[in-house]
Every structure is written in structure tokens, then in C-alpha cells.
Amino acid sequence: MGFFGERKLEQHQLNRDFKETKMADDGVRLVKPGMKYEGAQGVTYDAGVSRNTVGAEKVCMNILPMPPGVKSKPHIHRGIETIAYMLEGECTLFHGEQLENQTLIKQGEQIFIPENVPHAPYNLSDKKCVWVVVHSSGDDQDELVRTTELDYILENFGG
């Protein structure tokens, strides 16, 4: 079986196992809500379009709900760009070589994070926020590198 046949077989496996992803003969796929996963960043995502769900290789999109007080572990995406849209609420993004910059992203705003920039979202508000996160890779965990040397910054933030 050729390359496309193999992808189709993998996709049918996803359909049978998760009943979340639908595939037409032309390769157009629908991802329904319900699948979740925890990333190396220490936060739980609602799985969306990715290599694992639809076979995407160059782009992925996931939903990141963050209850009040939740923070990501500092990290970079080596060679991968990130765009994030704040669907609901607001959140502070710590970014820079030492997480020295803080940007408050509010509902309806978008932010671009260039490749290799250390960053970590931290919901300092008293309400849940929801991000739509897009990466220029088939999976948001591709080339993700934890910057553990920066963990202390968020652990000690605010006293």
C-alpha cells in the first residue's frame, strides 16, 4: 500500500479508537472535542488538529484552558513559531531569556512567539482563560525543550 493508503489506515485507527476524528476520501478531517493530553509544559490541552489526530505535518492547533493560578513550565520550541489567540479571559505571558518580560493578553488578542524564545503563560487572574494555540509543526511537543533553569522565576513570582 502506498503512502496515502498508509495514512488512511492510521486515520481509521484513530477513528476506531477515539471516535473524535473523521476523514473523507479527499483527506479533509474533522476533530471533535473530547481528547485531552498533558504536555511537557505541565498543562492539559484539549487536542485539536495535529499529526496525532489528522496526520498534519506542518501545523497544529490545540485549545489550552487554564484555570486561575495555573502556569506552564518555562520552555522553548526549537525552530518552531507559535501564534496564540485568547478566546476567553486573560493571561500573562512571561517571556525572554530570563522570563524578564510580561505581556498581558486579553480576550480577542493574539500573540506571536518567535522560535527559540523562552516563555510560560501564567493565569494570574481569578477567572479561567482559554487559548487557541497554533504551532508551525505537526505537534506542539515537537522540539519542545524545557528550560528548567528558569523554573525558579515563576515559583518565586509574587513573593
Model-derived regions: residue spans:
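A short beta-strand-loop-beta hairpin characteristic of the jelly-roll/cupin
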Residues: 80-107, 117
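A short, N-terminal "cap"/entry segment at the start of jelly-roll beta-barrel domains
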Residues: 1-58, 73, 146-159
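Ligand-binding loop in jelly-roll beta-barrel domains
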Residues: 106-107, 115-141
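Conserved hydrophobic/aromatic beta-strand scaffold that supports enzyme active sites
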Residues: 61-65, 83, 102, 110-112
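Short beta-strand His + acidic residue motifs that chelate non-heme Fe in jelly-roll/DSBH
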Residues: 73-75, 93-94, 102, 113, ...
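Conserved short histidine dyad/triad with adjacent acidic residue
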Residues: 49, 62-78
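A generic "binding-loop/recognition-motif" signal
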Residues: 68-70, 79, 98, 117-118, ...
